[in-house]
Amino acid sequence: LRILGREELKDMEPNISDEACAALYAPTAGIICPFELNIAMAENAAMNGVEFRFNTEVQDLKSTEKGWEIYTSQGICETRYVVNAAGVYADVFHNMISKNKIHITPRKGEYCLLDKSAGSHVGRTIFALPGKYGKGVLITPTVHGNLLVGPTAVDIEDKEGTNTTKEG
């Protein structure tokens, strides 16, 4: 990582705002397709013995001498390790086993995917300064040559809230 001054920043990204006076540059940062990455990770996990349980609700977790018993809508599973990767539902699993209860307030963000004709405006991911809701808005090239701009950030109550808005 290194700090770029205005001149070097403008050399690297000529379309950057004239108001930009400096930037943090991460030369080893890259762009991936998140869908393909997740499929590849799941394939690798399956080849290494991971069992997937789809459409199976976790109802309770119990610690045992050998690891965990997971009580589900499809029966009991035993495992040595549990990884809480439940996203906005991570608080539900955490609260099943911890005395220190937490609550996750879901936050929804919307992106705008620009046409490929806009793809040459920037050559790398550019973040604005972070705000109170997160890392801030970014503009990034995609692996398919488009530009992605966003996200917005709105706190919501519904953990299943995936609708989009006209304002988006």
Model-assigned labels for residue ranges:
Residues 60, 76, 81, 86-168:
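Active-site substrate-recognition segment that forms the wall
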Residues 1-54, 60-66, 71:
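Flavin (FAD/FMN) cofactor-binding and adjacent substrate-gating region
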